[in-house]
Amino acid sequence: DEGSISVYNNGPGIHVEKTKNLSGTEMYTPQLIFGEFMAGSNFEDSQDRIVGGQNGIGSKLTVVFSKLFTVETLDSQSKQLYKQSFREGLTIIDPPTLESSGTKKPYTKISFIPDYVEFKLNVKTFLPTLRKLLETRTWQAAAYTSAKVYYNESIIPIKTFEDFCQMFT
């Protein structure tokens, strides 16, 4: 779909197991992560800890400000392929689908279509700017990680921050 964004990670996948949210409702872990606020463990401010992120708020806001948000993950432990979509800013939650993955390699793929109307953006005129922004952020990510980073299925040919800086000299 025009204006859709996907992020793919070939790591071990999200654990596909039943758990309970704060009110005791049973659901699968990916739904808890992406569809429930206050679902993490990083809320006790009196504890010393070293963590990244802001309690999952980035992923939750992405769901809330999307027309369509889909999580697809293949759990390396359970070998289950989990797919679920959240629509219209988390007002519609599709039931998850699960299937056995056999011998496929684990991964997680997040796809979403931002609610461009909510942001008062014309998708056709904004897309070139968005593409350039995402490409720039992808190059920056490649400069700071040891992972292979791709943009639109093309590998980013830098491995270090120094490689990134050389682009501007």
Locate the predicted segments by residue.
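ATPase catalytic-site recognition across NTP-hydrolyzing enzymes
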Residues: 31-32
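GHKL-type ATPase core
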Residues: 3-27, 43-169
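Conserved helix-loop functional segments at active or binding sites
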Residues: 35-44
